[in-house]
């Protein structure tokens, strides 16, 4: 592993990553606040402990639905059948959050998606699961497979609704990452999350995320509640052009859920600022190439590399570029070959992938011989 140490001459600062805990405390049992763009964690409280997801599990249901649409196996206009299981388990007779779907009717996928988001319809979630996979259990297996692909390594799903099951557990960190995944991967569907209400079967229901109506930039994502888990929410907000994603869970009431969510995102928007570290296509460092037409290759970010910093800090940042090297040709432009690790003091606070700025073809015999002699004499510095 090669490590290239460098000091970022940015004349800016990054406080110790524990700054958030010193300046803010949430009453939620579990909480996390992330910068959507960089994934920087601005605040966390027991974010890696297992918790019951309640209806926030429906975000994973939506991820599978959107993935099926993206792969051509489902369309928003497809009509799905309302089975007796969906009607009894998630419908009006269940006593839980429901779309009030009629037994034996068919409903368009788009309406089911809107119901899952706005009304938290358990019947809508089950209809989607059965329509896609045949059974909810098979659909849950699809949820877990996609969750692992996304990188949600500490979560396990057993149903499409979030109804209580002792084997269904997630973490606040995984829910925040899931929210970021949905925003990043499926922006064409994001507008559903901010719809204020939905009417179905003659019954009008408001969006259960009350924060979308209070004028603080919240436009998603999903609330949840069970008697055992308490009240929780995955929140997304546009904070003056910077998007934040938050999770609060384990609260005692809807009012407390809304208040703790509002406090967390408002604090994050005021306490931190976005700073551009490297412009798009700017060379961050160079990586050695053994036996190539060129002895090194420039490393760039995937667009601009930005940092999310405490507002008003003025301490210097340090950074290191890490890669397994020397690299062997051919190296193709755009290959991910390194990562930029940003530190505050000695603590890692952000990681950004780095890519080859240009291609490097295999060199001739003389070039390989020269590199071999250099390696024998000096090693790769």
Regions found by a protein language model. Give the residues of each.
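A general, composition-driven signal for non-globular sequence regions
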Residues: 10-11, 52, 100, 251
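Active-site-adjacent loops and short helices of periplasmic peptidoglycan-processing enzymes
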Residues: 20-173, 180-186, 198
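Domain-terminus/edge residues, biased toward the C-terminal soluble/receptor-binding domains
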Residues: 152-156, 164-381
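Hydrophobic alpha-helical membrane context
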Residues: 14-15, 70, 272
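Bacterial Sec-dependent signal peptides at the C-terminal "C-region" and cleavage site
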Residues: 15-22, 355
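Bacterial N-terminal signal peptides
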Residues: 5-15
């Amino acid at each position: 592993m090669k490590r290239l140490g460098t000091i970022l001459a940015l004349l800016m600062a990054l406080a110790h990553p524990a700054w958030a805990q010193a300046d803010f405390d949430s009453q939620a049992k579990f909480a996390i606040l992330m910068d959507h763009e960089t994934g920087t964690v601005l605040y966390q409280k027991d974010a890696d402990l297992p918790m019951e997801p309640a209806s926030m599990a429906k975000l994973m249901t939506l991820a599978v639905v959107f993935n099926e649409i993206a792969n051509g196996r489902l369309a928003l206009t497809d009509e799905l059948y309302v089975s007796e299981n969906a009607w009894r388990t998630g419908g009006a007779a269940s006593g839980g959050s429901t779309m009030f779907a009629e037994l034996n009717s068919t409903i368009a996928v788009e309406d089911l998606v809107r119901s899952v988001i706005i009304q938290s319809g358990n019947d809508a979630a089950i209809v989607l699961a059965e329509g896609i996979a045949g059974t909810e259990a098979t659909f849950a297996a699809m949820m877990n497979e996609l969750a692992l692909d996304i990188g949600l390594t500490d979560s396990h799903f057993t149903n499409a609704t979030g109804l209580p099951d002792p084997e269904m557990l997630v973490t606040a960190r995984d829910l925040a990452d899931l929210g970021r995944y949905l925003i990043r991967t499926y922006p064409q569907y994001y507008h559903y999350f901010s719809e204020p209400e939905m009417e179905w079967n003659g019954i009008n229901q408001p969006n259960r995320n009350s924060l979308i109506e209070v004028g603080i930039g919240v436009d998603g994502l999903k609330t949840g509640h069970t008697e055992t888990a308490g009240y929780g929410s995955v929140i997304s907000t546009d904070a003056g052009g910077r998007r934040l994603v938050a999770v609060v869970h384990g609260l005692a009431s809807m009012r407390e859920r809304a208040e703790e969510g509002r406090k967390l995102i408002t604090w994050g928007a005021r306490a931190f600022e976005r700073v551009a570290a490297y412009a798009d296509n700017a060379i961050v460092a160079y990586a050695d190439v053994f036996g190539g037409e060129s002895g090194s290759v420039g490393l760039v970010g995937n667009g601009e590399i930005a940092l999310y910093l405490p507002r008003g800090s003025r301490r210097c940042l340090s950074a290191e570029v890490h890669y397994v090297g020397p690299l062997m040709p051919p190296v193709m432009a755009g290959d991910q070959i390194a990562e930029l690790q940003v530190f505050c003091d000695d603590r890692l606070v952000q990681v950004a992938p780095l890519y080859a700025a240009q291609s490097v073809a295999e060199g001739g015999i003389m070039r390989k011989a020269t590199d071999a002699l250099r390696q024998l004499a000096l090693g790769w510095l």
